[in-house]
């Protein structure tokens, strides 16, 4: 019997890149896609919890961490990333058995593209809060928000962009969804972060808080290395992933045809925010189910054990 805590690593050559992937456990295949600037390390705790039931595969997306591109980085495409996923499924499930797929935030966008493009390779897809602005009541406001975040990065760097993101997505009393005005305000507030550093404005701490679990004790050397890798991915995410992925227009016809295999996840604490509003809007449009998860948009890092337990239930539901 395979030790579910043992990690088997490998490299997969895909069109234009080489993907680092990690596999734990045994059973039906479950592929877990990291979102934002995260890599496979974001799922270390959750993957170990789920590996008693599934063969859990995680990976570094192309252009991140240990998955180098063959050439210079350019704007990324959800469709290309979706095709990468199917190549990984083909490698790990050579008998053709379909796999379950989980994605959160930007990787939830990839999950939607994968289901639309390759429905026969997927048994169940859980897309947790895909920030697809096309599904918002005001798509232009959503596009403007993420464009403002990218511009903050171009003008003032990672710290300003992360502050703009946090400000733009923060709820205000009586407001249904955030907007670009507060993203710009957040960028201005972060402009003096170098001169007046605080925990809220420190770029590395902000990136760690966004992408990695807050440990109850000092991080191990392995955890520290993971945090550094994910922080180093932020420029690629902010320049080449954020706007192309949030601007993705889902294939509603294809998703409606596969709605029985699709679940849209929303955070208990983030249902009024842009990504959850988009998720619920998509569910209504295509007739897919909605499942509430612990925490907010980054609930998988806020409450990893509770999140894993909820994901286990959602994957097991028929």
Where are these regions (language model features)?
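Catalytic active-site module of serine/aspartate enzymes centered on a nucleophile-bearing elbow/loop
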Residues: 286-318
